Structures are given as C-alpha cells and as structure tokens.
Amino acid sequence: AGVCSAVWADWYGFKMEAYDAIPENAALLQNAGACIIIHSDDENGIQRLNQEAAKAQADGRRIGINIPDETAIGWFTLNPAKAMGIDKFTGSLEKGKMADVVLWNGNPLSVYSRPEKVWIDGALLYDALDRKRRPVSDFELGQPGEGDVK
C-alpha cells in the first residue's frame, strides 16, 4: 500500500508493457491502497489525462468500485508529484506551492467541459472570453480565416 503505480486508463495490448493489463486496473489498485498515476507516453494522450482518469474511474464504477472525483483528479495531479518526491512543492492547490491552474466550465472529468482560463506561473495565458488570450488554430493553414494577415 502507498506504492505509486503508473497505469494507462484503457490502452492495453498495444505494446509489451501494456500487454496483459485490464481497464479496471486503476480502480482495483486504488481500492487496495496504492497511489495511482494515470499517465501517457503519447503527445496527444498527455493533453487529455483528465479524460483518461475519467475512463478509469468509470471502469471502476462498472465493477462496483466508486472512486470520488477528487481522488481521480489526484491521479494526474498530486500523485505524480508524490512519486517524484516533489509533492511538498507542487501537485495540489495549497498556499506556498507552485501550480499551473485550469479553471473549467464544468467537471474536469467530463468530456463536455472546456477550459475557461489557464494560469501558468501565475500569469493568465488563456481566457476563453478574451479573443487576445485565445490561440488561433492553424487547422486551415494558408487559407483566409481568423488570425490571418489580411
């Protein structure tokens, strides 16, 4: 108990270190008292750890293990900091700790929630309601559109 386990939510069988795992892994380990870390080694997956944690939480619920939202959020915030031995400095919102903060318009574990504001190193860098603080998509690169020089 108390040992941190870095697991995927449900990406199993796609390579050797994920060969024989199960989607209920995070919930079963949490239920046994382990420190769970939902992780990804993919540049896209790392951007959606909140959704990955929600999938693992739902897999636990399906087998009768109810993981509170606060615990599931800790799987990608506080627990990685614990595993690296830096939880006294980061990983949770507490006075004196370093943090980048995302303010969501709903439950951060919901696929329907979107970030409203993002602070990095104390500076507001993204604000969904402020056009100057929203990134411009390069999806239509080279085509006339928002953000292009006219």
Q: Where in this protein do the model-derived segments appear?
A:
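A generic membrane alpha-helix/interface feature
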Residues: 20, 51, 118, 139-141
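C-terminal cap of metal-dependent C-N hydrolases
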Residues: 82, 94-138
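Gram-negative outer-membrane assembly/targeting C-terminal domains
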Residues: 130, 139-150
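His/Asp/Glu-enriched, well-ordered alpha-helical/loop segment
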Residues: 2-104, 124
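Short alpha-helix boundary/capping motifs
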Residues: 57-58, 108-109, 143-147
